[in-house]
Amino acid sequence: MAVYAIGDIQGCWREFKALLKKLRLKDSDELWLAGDLINRGPDSLKVLRKLRAMDQQVHIVLGNHDLHFLAIVFGGHNAGAKDTFAELLGADDVEDLANWLRKQKLLHRNYGHVMTHAGLPGC
């Protein structure tokens, strides 16, 4: 079993897909994702759909871009001029994806390691 930690995919589907191909994940491998899965890049929708399909193999902590998206969907916030959520917000499955995303953690701990998107006090 291998554990791979990746941060800040930021909607870059093509690059993420290429990385997954290089990793050649086995069923027993784990993918730890340190937040900012979406926004900035052009393909946030593809990234979220892929990660949701890999749900049993990935451990995700939310980053500020992910939380910003959830605030737009559930909290009445507006997307900013630089946000690249348009395709995602218009998707038929946006609520399902947002509900799945909001169940992810802010911190993941396993194998004697802790993963967050940002730092921890005292570290």
Label the predicted regions.
Residues 1-50, 54:
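N-terminal active-site segment of His-dependent metallophosphoesterases
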Residues 45-123:
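Active-site neighborhood of divalent metal-dependent phosphoester bond hydrolases
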